[in-house]
Amino acid sequence: NLFQFAEMIVKMTGKEAVH
């Protein structure tokens, strides 16, 4: 699903943002 893909991106970007 497109939403799942977007959610994965958010998680990845979130990890990047944490650091």
From Swiss-Prot:
Asked if Thylakoid is a keyword of the record, the answer is no
Where is the chain membrane-spanning?
none
Q: How is the cofactor bound?
A: Binds 1 Ca(2+) ion.
S-S pairs? none
Q: Does the keyword Disulfide bond apply?
A: yes
Where does it primarily localize? secreted
> Mind listing the UniProt keywords for this protein, alphabetically?
Blood coagulation cascade inhibiting toxin, Calcium, Cytolysis, Disulfide bond, Hemolysis, Hemostasis impairing toxin, Hydrolase, Lipid degradation, Lipid metabolism, Metal-binding, Secreted, Toxin
Which is one GO molecular function term here?
A: phospholipase A2 activity
Protein modification: Contains 7 disulfide bonds.
Question: What is the annotated localization of this protein?
Answer: Secreted
Enzyme Commission no: 3.1.1.4
Q: Name one GO cellular component term.
A: extracellular region
Q: Which cofactor does it need?
A: Ca(2+)
Mention one GO biological process in which this protein takes part, according to its record: killing of cells of another organism
Top-level EC class = hydrolase
Q: In which tissues is it expressed?
A: Expressed by the venom gland.
Catalysis performed (reactions): a 1,2-diacyl-sn-glycero-3-phosphocholine + H2O = a 1-acyl-sn-glycero-3-phosphocholine + a fatty acid + H(+)
Tell me the function of this protein: Snake venom phospholipase A2 (PLA2) that shows enzymatic, indirect hemolytic and anticoagulant activities. Interestingly, anti-PFIIc'serum completely inhibits anticoagulant activity, partially inhibits the indirect hemolytic activity, but does not inhibit enzymatic activity. PLA2 catalyzes the calcium-dependent hydrolysis of the 2-acyl groups in 3-sn-phosphoglycerides.
Name the family the entry cites. Belongs to the phospholipase A2 family. Group II subfamily.
Other information:
This phospholipase A2 is distinct from phospholipases of Russel's viper venom reported from other parts of India.
Q: What is this protein called?
A: Neutral phospholipase A2 RVV-PFIIc'
